[in-house]
């Protein structure tokens, strides 16, 4: 187990730190007394704010040995703070690979003494990943009370999940308690065969002016059952408006299960006082396995969730609820 810190404060801020990782020898995957392998890289680790921190990663992160523990993880955390802002943090990964599950955070929720602590803001953060392969799952996550003007870019990225691997899904999620506005997820030359593929920008009160762009991407499921879930939603909120989803050459492999594929620029979390308007899906090319069906492809959908299950449906044609949502 290794933890690397560019800057840390137990009672204050961690700002303007840089962590450069260019390993000459990758980290070894070993059978140890703990029964799992877990390593973490931190740009800024603090309690009252973490801003302007950068993590640069080049070369392979691990050896090619595969480990199978559900606790395995390689955590890349640009900013960790219990309160205050987590703004202008960056993660760059180039020409690298990992056989551990990779979790990348520009800002993250922290749990202490059964309490959740969120940064007050996660704004203007960036993740750029190029020429990278994860032989387990790959997840990029931003969590804060407010998240705006964040960008996540993939170019030539693979999330290769073997059917025998313990898999938690491959996801890109920007999640805010209040508002998530003006965020961009741009995916190019990407493939994932995780059981749970989720690409979401979401907030409770407002998700607006967000954009997801998908080019030359292959999504499927590695398991023998060919059962999984795929969700692509640019603005999931009680108030979702002016969000854009652009899809050019999306290839969908076999999904045998029902209620598996949901694609929309906007989604609302129920019908009570929710609104979805001025959202647009631009669709140029889909290539779909012959037995695969897209459950919902729409300008907006409704997401229902309780303690037992979750489901989705097309938003009803009610001008007070949904208007000017377009599928082009």
What are these regions (language model features)?
Residues 1-3, 8-40, 44-328:
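Surface-exposed loop/turn motifs in large extracellular/passenger domains
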